[in-house]
């Protein structure tokens, strides 16, 4: 990764409002952490078994070709925007098809790239959103989801990437939640997955006529599929299936009564990912929970499993086989190690690391998070991961920053902290990452416990976290900060007005401030999902409830310093959500730091923007969290008596 020299002046595309000049000690002190780059395996070149690698370029993430392990990579794309996904065409190789948006607006366009000449061609219309690209097994066609038709939902297209004019619609869904999973090997059908709250339906779509067939339409086959792949003879499907209590198994679904019987790994109840080799003989799959995942390779013909792969349990992602069926590529990382590209050879049974980043010079190279469990207000068990600074270097009770993930349908799993290791190494600040109710990974019931009128129960879970912090003799409950992005940004604001007397300050990144204005103004392709998750503001009773719990309507109750970060091109949480909160806070003379990225979306992705935002946020916490005494912008008595407002009247009706 190329790290640009940090300057005291912000990058030209950042609009700064109320953020003081950042000391050089912070700008330069945080810089080494940005030199630690994660290199992600994306796929294989089908003829040479070279790897496609996603690495940070000068400002944005770009595609590189790596011909041999630990070798010199060749920059393949030099695009002004981040590359969101790329792959060689199966069997054929060239061209590479990749996706990129504009300033983080998530209106991804598809491009083809000749890796020899560097010539790039736009494959889509330049205005729509296109994603979910899946390649057929011959390398002649791709299937993808797109809004090009102008309808409310994404439709499914197929196209020959060598001929953009060949693109055509094969299915127009009447709802959202559709994914393209695989192509039949004869090219005649596409395997599509329709995800709802209650089931994952598998459909077969004829690529010529568009005729659809529901594959899981009987009691025997009515299963919640999460992922699926055709067998090479197209007579069956392997899939990940979600069962009761969060159990995930690997199952085989025959499509013909007289089809061959394929074997699946026995006694697997915690599968997380799977991928078939092109010949269908080998299945790679990942099992485990949280940070203790294990990679396996299984023979679907003999039912035999390869010997244990010599890698410590950690995190695995993006399993992909070479066309010759001999090597499995994947990404491997942990809390102590950034993701890097690896391969496993099924013939030699050898693991090879292809990319490397040296972290030995950083003090937190061996940091190990602690899994903390606690009871919430209703005795529900919640959990989170705590990173502590070195007690020898930082004795006594340490300040804490609680960092809340977005979603809420997501889960925090201990990954490499990146620049946030600076908090542990230099500031001596502990970091706590909770998984409150509504998080995934703990079963369907847990994920539903913040639905509808129970939305603020997840905020009460943060109250339980604050209670637990007060019981730990090594943590300072009088110096707690809070931060979060997207839904975690909303949670940050909600915590500030419910528990303002128990936290010092908060940093909201791309968080929404009013449920109703968010649901009205978010992009149309995101609206159905947002309404399903957060509530439908068009229903009068729900509208009233959402207005009652929106942070914007409680701005007068926020008395702690607040930093807000927004992206002008954000399609999910419009920057207007942040603007209206800043205006409300300014009206009451609160301390508010505001940063708007004019070339950013739902997160800061340009290198210099991300570095400057992180340095500013670090300075914010250094200013308002570290001092022994609270820095108070408003009357101290108003802070110490702020009550929790969980008495907000809720409408009556079914839960």
PLM features: what roles do these ranges have?
Residues 350, 355-478, 483-486, 520-528:
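Cap/lid segment of the alpha/beta-hydrolase catalytic domain
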Residues 426, 433-655:
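Active-site-proximal cap/loop segments of hydrolase catalytic domains
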Residues 35-54, 80-99, 110, 127-148, ...:
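Conserved beta-propeller blade repeats
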Residues 193, 205, 240, 253, ...:
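Generic beta-strand/beta-sheet core signal
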Residues 107-109, 154-155, 249, 340, ...:
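Short, solvent-exposed loop/turn and secondary-structure capping segments
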Residues 9-27, 56-75, 94-95, 99-122, ...:
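Beta-propeller blade-edge and WD-like acidic-aromatic loop motif
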Residues 2-38, 633-655:
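N-terminal pre-domain segments of enzymes
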Residues 199-200, 222, 245-248, 271, ...:
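Flexible loop/turn segments at secondary-structure boundaries
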